[in-house]
Amino acid sequence: MAVQKSKKSRSRRDMRRSHDAIDGPTLSVDSTTGETHRRHHVTADGYYKGRKVVNK
């Protein structure tokens, strides 16, 4: 089993973890309705890329 020779300091541990943060979802504004939605997803009104794709 692998065992470290010396203990990693809190600073080294935290520097390694600095890239682990999660970003928020990427949002876009629909050109037709002006509604904010997630990228590559249909809006709540049923529009995708400016066209109506879901009929309610």
UniProtKB/Swiss-Prot annotation:
Organism domain of life: Bacteria
Biased segments, Basic residues type: 1-16
Gene: rpmF
GO cellular component: large ribosomal subunit
The entry's keywords: Ribonucleoprotein, Ribosomal protein
Region listing for Disordered, in residue ranges: 1-56
SUPFAM superfamilies: Zn-binding ribosomal proteins (SSF57829)
Family in the record: Belongs to the bacterial ribosomal protein bL32 family.
A Pfam family it matches: Ribosomal_L32p
GO MF annotation terms: structural constituent of ribosome
Listed GO biological process terms: translation
Protein's recorded name: Large ribosomal subunit protein bL32
